[in-house]
Amino acid sequence: MARKGLIQREKKREKLEQKYRLIRRSSKKEISTAPSLSEKWKIHGKLQSSPRNSAPTRLHRRCFSTGRPRANYRDFRLSGHILREMVHACLLPGATRSSW
């Protein structure tokens, strides 16, 4: 299980990303439509003044039950081994074991 501090840090990043999402999108759109290089630099400076953790690339998906950052399935928000255990226990409706 992941440390609680790592999970809280990730939640903080999610909140910051949602808060600054529109600001970052509008700034990037302004940069692409700015006619001169000096205006692009000014807009870029405004974009850089936003917090580093507000960038969407800083987010990392985590398993909501264990906090594991790797091998996550997007549809279930679970890591692989927890997903397997829950499917075997019939806790996920619609998920079946594969056999071939």
Curated annotation (Swiss-Prot):
SUPFAM superfamilies: Glucocorticoid receptor-like (DNA-binding domain) (SSF57716). Keywords: Chloroplast, Plastid, Ribonucleoprotein, Ribosomal protein, RNA-binding, rRNA-binding. It is found in: Plastid, Chloroplast. One of its GO terms (cellular component) is chloroplast. One of its GO terms (molecular function) is structural constituent of ribosome. GO terms for biological process: translation. Part of the 30S ribosomal subunit. Binds 16S rRNA, required for the assembly of 30S particles. Belongs to the universal ribosomal protein uS14 family. HAMAP family: Ribosomal_uS14_1. This is Small ribosomal subunit protein uS14c. It comes from Oenothera argillicola. The lineage of its organism: Eukaryota, Viridiplantae, Streptophyta, Embryophyta, Tracheophyta. The gene is rps14.
